[in-house]
Amino acid sequence: MSMDLSQFHHQLSARFASKTAHASDVLTSDQVSFFEEYGYLAGVDLLDDDQVEMLRGDLAAIMHPEMSGDPRFYEYNFNESADPSKVLFHALGAWRVSRAFHDLIFLPRLTACFRQLLRGQPRFWHDQVFVKPAKDGAVVAWHQDYSYWTRTVP
């Protein structure tokens, strides 16, 4: 078995850190106010094109059917759709398998953004990867996650 990257609680390479400078205040006060009023924030550029391509490359490797037996995944479903002509890939544990997904959660610019929005230190709970191809993908039914994630404090 390959190395379980969850054993490392820091970035493992400069693939992300060197491309995005650390900033204590990534968001404007208007963006933070919008989040506090509406509960979401869209259109925040946190990754550059190279970082997105690294994630896409690692995603393609993760989605390879031979990965389905990798014990580092907490959950792995190549297709959760009831319709075999649709695609709904779903996996938990990508950060344990992929250096790009691992290093993403320790990206200083990303964690600084979370600190601003949460007004406190973020805590990584788990990762979840859904892939639903455009015009081809299945759907995830509307739901509220609070019934699943009932913790509001550590």
Describe the function of each predicted region.
Residues 151-154:
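Short, glycine/small-residue-enriched coil/turn segments at secondary-structure junctions
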